[in-house]
């Protein structure tokens, strides 16, 4: 069907009237242009045109190829009419243009006219709009679309149009078209090789591809050729998202004999609308700029809160992750590109690498950033090659063309690469030039050129296996140092399995079902896109103060011992400058201030993974602060004090004070997730709390947050844990735990501690006035891993530490305390006939006078260490058959009574007189050595070599020991067994003892070469016989570091006569306390003679449960004189 002449004239008249009414100003502007040979478009909205005249719309949809030339002719007549009728201005100002074209846009949104997919054969001849992405652009060509021919017979000249369907080839005429009808078929082409072409125009072909997000499931994107002519040439470039308005046509190459005709479908474009530039063009609107200016004017007293409001609108489906959102926003804002004095171009785009465990939201940030950026490409590293990332050479129609890759397609925009470490190594090195020099040099298929890649790269990758904080980031992600140094920021997101974080995230996802919450404070995606396009037009300048902070921080990073060589290069200083400019853009400022520099240093510290200021920060667990100004104040103090810029700190704090004084009220953070945080966040001040500096706010209970003390963030140190300066909460926890343990300890319980002789001696030396303390004393100043003790005792020990200025916490951090089971004491039932006076006497023995000498304190400690199973322990002692001479000498010397007039003799005599025991002379007479009889020798051998447990001899021995007079038998048994045991130990470990003796200091060496009697600091005091009796179970080596066995404290039942009742129960034998003073005399004798053996490690027990022990509740772990060298045993708690 063809249009009639009447329809053609009607369509032309209607369109001319429409143009004169709606586009008169556009035509006048075109007529004022000086150049007449250019092609000028007049964009006409199809919806408006069809509303004015429906018949024109119907004809246009039915015959678009016929109607469009009619529109162009009508436009020419309208322009001529406007030029002639204009009398307000001189005629010479309007120049008639012959190349004016009508461009149709704004088709009705319906499936018949608007397509998201590539048209098919049934769409041929229809005017459609197709949306896609430009993947290839060809070079611009000169197209000859018309030729002049002359008839050789009648000399008639006529024009021949090139056939679009046959790739603009010319078909020679078969007959003369003149009216005379000469019938000649011979013609001469006037546009020969010598003559210039009569009519030419620009021609270009581009290829578009369907957008992936608009495809159905499982579909592969298809592509289509678009024909551009005249003013449409070079209107778009590779990577642009465009909407093409045009006519779907078929074309084929000229047919030849025995050649198959290949028909292809192309779209002859009438108008191209670049979707990327829509947001940019909308920025010129004054109302949008005014809206953003009013927003920042409302936050002039707290600009950080306004910035956080923008960050909350960035990827709102991800909860928290404050540092990551801030870093992504600064990267999207970008810095200012500049050219230095030497002419070298310094890039302004920043690059960001997100390294994290699976499920930490890395891909969500990449997708959102690609959506709000006008020009972006999103790809994955697993399917990317060198040619796919840079450029590929493709041969099409006998010619080589360059197809742009992901980096070239994203020129001037954003390139998001997921799974960055999946790119092959030789392909990964190809993007080095694109990231730093922002160009790609190509030498392929005879084409040598350089393409621009002025793009921002936002990459995400998973660590290689489990992230190891002890190695560098390049090893964890398997990326080379040259590539890693090109990233301005590298944020590590570690999933530390924090229970509070898991609870918040699960509640946030389930309650909102993954959708962003409906909140008035969140910006829409269109508004975010418009804002980031607007701030990219700003060009902030760096102030000298900001330059000082950035340069000082760079120098500090270079001098850091734990610095990463791949990150701390000169590129780091350029990155700091770019990020500072980006933050100034984000704050809608034209100047880079101290605030921008401090924030950039804070984010860089999170990126360095072992920074010079605070170490490591897990960016995953950072959330938005309730008081942004207070958080910035804390950051400012930490950064500037560490950098030594106190003058800048004072000025900045004054500026912040002025802002706070000027604002009407305290700023409230419009955190969209605050409800979830307040409802679901519990206090994280428990034993497994992750500690860190007050750097970025994170999980914390709202009740524990004050304005003066910013909340401690829940961060995970990836290398070395950083101890926070404020340990108040931890001390409170320890105080509560210690008191809880103290409350659970009953009178029957005691705690077993294993210590060395040297440690025990030092402990006894310093315990003078630490017996009775109040229960309500504070434990905050004493950090102890020991057993619970009385509060009054802790108070005195705390005062001792305050006076000495020592930090016991530091002393105990290098030791490991191993828990052991506590041993319960049996309740010793007191005899009903025991008077109250005797009970008070035992308590008095438990607390001797504070002014007692060293010997008195030693006796108190040793008395406390009596074991109830002494008889069984004697059975295990192995007695050598032939003791050495030294051992025999020791045994003989240990049995000698003290000399008359000696110090030990006077003490022993006084004690025996006070207790009405056997006189000392009788004891000495009974202990004189004499030739033993055969029967006695046999008895001694049976004692020294105990029979097997449970045998008849064992039972007989027990009965004999029970019935033996309690004057000398138990003394002989203990003395002989202790001497033989000491002799065996000397024989069994000679090398070990010798090495330990040589390692001692001269003042501590008590071997045979230094046989000097030890002198105590204080004179020995009087000791009760009951105390001496309990020492009979221990062997003393003559050293100041007394030996003690691994015993369990038991309080013997008190009898009416002042003695001790004997309980004959299998393993429990308690001896009579009479005639036991000889043991102390023998011990003193050994000290005077100076005959000692090597150091041996023994254990003793301290009771903390009540009155069961003689020394109540002392703990060696709280000693104020403990040094690292004192801990020569394995500590057990």
Curated annotation (Swiss-Prot):
Free-text function comment from the UniProt entry: Component of the MCM8-MCM9 complex, a complex involved in homologous recombination repair following DNA interstrand cross-links and plays a key role during gametogenesis. The MCM8-MCM9 complex probably acts as a hexameric helicase required to process aberrant forks into homologous recombination substrates and to orchestrate homologous recombination with resection, fork stabilization and fork restart.
SMART domains documented for this protein: AAA, MCM
Source organism (scientific name): Danio rerio
Low complexity compositional bias, start-end: 702-718
Residue intervals of the MCM domain: 304-509
Region (Disordered): 656-688, 702-737, 818-857, 878-901, 922-954, 999-1059
Pfam families: MCM, MCM_lid, MCM_OB
Cellular compartments per GO CC: MCM8-MCM9 complex; nucleus
Enzyme class: hydrolase
Localisation: Nucleus
GO molecular function terms noted in the UniProt entry: ATP binding; ATP hydrolysis activity; DNA binding; helicase activity
Example GO BP: DNA damage response
Keyword DNA damage: yes
Stretches with biased composition (Basic and acidic residues): 922-941, 1008-1020
Compositional bias (Polar residues): 719-737, 826-835, 1024-1042
PANTHER family reported for this sequence: DNA HELICASE MCM9 (PTHR11630:SF48), DNA REPLICATION LICENSING FACTOR MCM FAMILY MEMBER (PTHR11630)
Residue sites binding ATP per the record: 356-363
Quaternary structure (record): Component of the MCM8-MCM9 complex, which forms a hexamer composed of mcm8 and mcm9.
Name of the molecule in the record: DNA helicase MCM9
Protein keywords: ATP-binding, DNA damage, DNA repair, DNA-binding, Helicase, Hydrolase, Nucleotide-binding, Nucleus
The reaction(s) this protein catalyses: ATP + H2O = ADP + phosphate + H(+)
Protein family: Belongs to the MCM family.
CDD domains from the UniProt entry: MCM9
Protein EC: 3.6.4.12
Keyword Nuclease tagged: no
């Amino acid at each position: 069907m063809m249009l009639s002449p009447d329809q053609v004239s009607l369509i032309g008249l209607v369109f001319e009237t429409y143009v004169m009414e709606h586009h008169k100003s556009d035509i006048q502007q075109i007529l004022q242009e000086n150049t007449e040979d250019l092609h000028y478009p007049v964009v006409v909205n199809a919806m408006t045109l069809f509303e004015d005249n429906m018949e024109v719309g119907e004809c246009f949809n039915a015959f678009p190829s016929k109607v469009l030339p009619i529109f162009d002719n009508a436009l020419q007549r309208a322009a001529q009419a406007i030029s002639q009728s204009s009398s307000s201005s001189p005629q010479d100002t309007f120049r008639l243009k012959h190349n004016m074209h009508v461009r149709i846009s704004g088709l009705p949104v319906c499936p018949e006219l608007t397509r998201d997919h590539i048209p098919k054969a049934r769409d041929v001849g229809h005017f459609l709009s197709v949306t896609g992405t430009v993947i290839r652009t060809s070079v611009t060509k000169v197209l000859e679309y018309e030729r002049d021919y002359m008839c050789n017979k009648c000399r008639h000249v006529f024009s021949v149009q090139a056939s679009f369907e046959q790739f603009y080839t010319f078909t020679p005429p078969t007959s003369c078209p003149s009216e005379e009808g000469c019938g000649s078929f011979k013609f001469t082409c006037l546009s020969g090789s010598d003559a210039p072409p009569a009519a030419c125009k620009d021609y270009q072909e581009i290829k578009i591809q369907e957008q992936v997000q608009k495809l159905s499931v499982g579909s592969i994107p298809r592509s289509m050729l678009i024909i551009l002519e005249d003013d449409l040439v070079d209107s778009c470039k590779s990577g642009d998202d465009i909407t093409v308005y045009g006519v779907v046509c078929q074309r084929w190459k000229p047919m030849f004999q025995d050649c198959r005709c290949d028909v292809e479908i192309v779209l002859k474009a009438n108008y191209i609308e670049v979707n990327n530039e829509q947001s940019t063009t909308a920025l010129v609107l004054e109302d949008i700029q005014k809206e953003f200016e009013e927003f920042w004017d409302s936050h002039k007293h707290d600009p950080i809160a306004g910035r956080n409001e923008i960050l909350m609108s960035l990827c709102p489906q991800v909860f928290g992750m404050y540092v990551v959102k801030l870093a992504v926003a600064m990267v999207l804002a970008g810095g200012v590109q500049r050219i230095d004095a030497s002419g070298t171009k310094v890039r302004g785009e920043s690059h960001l690498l997100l390294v994290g465990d699976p499920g930490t939201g890395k891909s969500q940030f990449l997708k959102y950033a690609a959506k709000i950026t006008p020009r972006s490409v999103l790809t994955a590293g697993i399917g990317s090659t060198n040619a796919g990332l840079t450029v590929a050479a493709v041969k099409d129609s006998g010619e080589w063309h360059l197809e742009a890759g992901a980096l070239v397609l994203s020129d001037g925009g954003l390139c998001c690469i997921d799974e960055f470490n999946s790119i092959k190594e030789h392909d990964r090195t190809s993007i080095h030039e694109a990231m730093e020099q922002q160009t790609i040099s190509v030498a392929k298929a005879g084409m040598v050129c350089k393409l621009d890649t002025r793009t921002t790269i936002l990459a995400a990758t998973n660590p290689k296996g489990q992230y190891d904080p002890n190695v560098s980031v390049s090893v964890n992600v398997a990326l080379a140092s040259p590539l890693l140094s090109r990233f301005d920021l590298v944020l590590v997101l570690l999933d530390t399995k924090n229970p509070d974080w898991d609870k918040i995230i699960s509640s946030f996802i389930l309650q909102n079902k993954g959708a962003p919450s409906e909140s008035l404070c969140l910006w829409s995606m269109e508004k975010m896109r418009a804002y980031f396009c607007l701030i990219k037009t700003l060009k902030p300048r760096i102030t000298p103060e900001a330059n000082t902070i950035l340069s000082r921080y760079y120098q500090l990073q270079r001098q850091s011992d734990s610095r990463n060589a791949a990150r701390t290069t000169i590129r780091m200083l350029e990155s700091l400058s770019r990020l500072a400019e980006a933050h100034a853009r984000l704050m809608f400022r034209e100047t880079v201030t101290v605030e921008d520099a401090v924030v950039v240093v804070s984010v860089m510290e999170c990126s360095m993974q072992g920074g010079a200021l605070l170490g490591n920060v897990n960016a995953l667990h950072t959330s938005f602060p309730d008081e942004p100004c207070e958080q910035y104040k804390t950051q400012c103090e930490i950064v500037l004090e560490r950098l030594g810029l106190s003058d800048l700190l004072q000025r900045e704090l004054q500026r912040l004070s002025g802002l706070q004084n000027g604002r009407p009220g305290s700023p409230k953070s419009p955190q969209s997730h605050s409800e979830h945080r307040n409802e679901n966040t519990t206090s994280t001040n428990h034993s497994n709390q992750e500690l860190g500096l007050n750097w970025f706010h994170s999980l914390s209970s709202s009740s524990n947050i004050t304005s003066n003390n910013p909340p401690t963030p829940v961060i995970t140190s990836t290398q070395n844990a950083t101890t926070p300066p404020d340990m108040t909460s931890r001390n409170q926890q320890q105080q509560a735990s210690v008191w809880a343990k103290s409350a659970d300890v009953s009178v029957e319980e005691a705690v077993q501690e294993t210590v060395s002789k040297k440690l025990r001696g030092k402990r006894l030396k310093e315990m003078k006035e630490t017996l009775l303390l109040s229960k309500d004393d504070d434990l905050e100043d004493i950090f102890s891993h020991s057993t619970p003790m009385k509060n009054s005792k802790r108070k005195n020990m705390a005062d001792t530490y305050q006076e000495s200025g020592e930090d016991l916490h530091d002393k105990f951090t290098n030791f490991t305390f191993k828990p052991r089971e506590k041993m319960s004491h049996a309740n010793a039932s007191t005899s009903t006939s025991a008077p109250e006076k005797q009970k008070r006497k035992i308590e008095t023995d438990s607390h001797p006078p504070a002014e007692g000498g060293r010997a008195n304190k030693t006796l108190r400690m040793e008395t406390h260490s009596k074991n109830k199973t002494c008889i069984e322990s004697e059975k295990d002692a192995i007695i050598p058959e032939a003791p050495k001479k030294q051992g025999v000498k020791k045994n003989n010397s240990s049995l000698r009574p003290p000399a008359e007039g000696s110090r030990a003799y006077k003490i022993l005599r006084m004690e025996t007189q006070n207790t009405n025991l056997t006189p000392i002379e009788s004891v000495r007479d009974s202990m004189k050595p004499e030739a033993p009889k055969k029967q006695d020798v046999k008895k001694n051998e049976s004692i020294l070599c105990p029979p097997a447990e449970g045998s008849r001899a064992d039972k007989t021995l027990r009965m004999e020991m029970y019935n033996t007079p309690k004057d000398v038998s138990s003394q002989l048994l203990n003395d002989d067994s202790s001497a033989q045991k000491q002799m065996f130990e000397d024989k069994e470990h000679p090398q070990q003892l010798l090495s330990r003796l040589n390692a001692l200091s001269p003042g501590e060496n008590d071997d045979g070469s230094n046989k000097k009697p030890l002198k105590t600091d204080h004179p020995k005091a009087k000791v009760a016989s009951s105390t001496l009796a309990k020492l009979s179970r221990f062997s003393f080596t003559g050293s100041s570091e007394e030996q003690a066995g691994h015993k369990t404290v038991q309080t013997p039942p008190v009898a009416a006569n002042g003695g001790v009742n004997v309980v004959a129960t299998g393993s429990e034998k308690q001896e009579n306390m009479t005639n036991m003073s000889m043991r102390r005399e023998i011990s003193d004798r050994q000290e005077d003679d100076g005959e000692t053996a090597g150091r041996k490690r023994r254990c003793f027990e301290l009771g903390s449960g009540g009155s069961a022990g003689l020394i109540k509740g002392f703990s060696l772990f709280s000693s104020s004189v403990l040094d690292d060298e004192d801990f020569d045993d394995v500590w057990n708690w």
